[in-house]
């Protein structure tokens, strides 16, 4: 387990009041009075992954009956980019080939959410999920593809709404065997054809 930390809500509230003052707003005006508290509550949720070791969700597993791939496709995803503390939102596709153990599908959802709920980079998030499935679970291989819109690209900087960033991480047998990797990627791409 990672070192326990907890979100300091009162400190966030004070910081948000200071930000409001710094941008020339009145934190006491109607509409903003409760904003510091709301932001602190939102951050407690958005960064709740800092208080856990997401890989711990893989500790409860079951004997595998096959070595066929397991794929969760189109898993909704939201995280906060660590560069600007703006969201990136999209979907994750997560696959693994069991060795001796499998996990419940909801555990994979919790794994992704645990890594997503922290200041994050999409590239790192993709690798962390793939590594946990490969190393912690001890799978034969894993593939993780994340497609997300980075709001820092949408709202500032390049200002290109709708741009999707795609990252992938491939581990183990799925990295070594082009045929198996292609099979997984074809299954993932079916979601794009569904519309």
Residue ranges and their predicted role:
Residues 1-195:
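A domain-level signal for the structural core that forms small-molecule/cofactor-binding pockets
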């Amino acid at each position: 387990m990672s070192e326990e930390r907890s979100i300091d809500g009162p400190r966030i509230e004070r910081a948000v009041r200071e930000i409001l003052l710094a941008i020339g707003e009145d934190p006491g005006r109607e509409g903003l009075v409760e904003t510091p508290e709301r932001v602190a509550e939102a951050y407690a949720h958005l960064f709740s992954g800092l208080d856990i070791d997401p890989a711990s969700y893989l500790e409860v597993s079951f004997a595998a009956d096959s070595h066929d791939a397991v794929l969760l496709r189109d898993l909704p995803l939201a995280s906060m980019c660590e560069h600007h503390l703006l969201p990136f939102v999209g979907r994750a596709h997560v696959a693994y080939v069991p060795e001796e153990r499998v996990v419940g599908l909801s555990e994979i959802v919790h794994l992704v959410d645990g890594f997503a709920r922290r200041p994050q980079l999409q590239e790192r998030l993709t690798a962390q999920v793939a590594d946990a499935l490969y190393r912690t679970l001890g799978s034969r291989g894993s593939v993780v593809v994340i497609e997300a819109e980075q709001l820092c690209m949408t709202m500032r900087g390049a200002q290109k709404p709708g741009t999707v960033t795609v990252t992938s991480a491939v581990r183990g047998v799925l990295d070594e065997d082009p045929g198996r990797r292609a099979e997984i990627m074809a299954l993932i791409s079916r979601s794009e054809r569904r519309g």
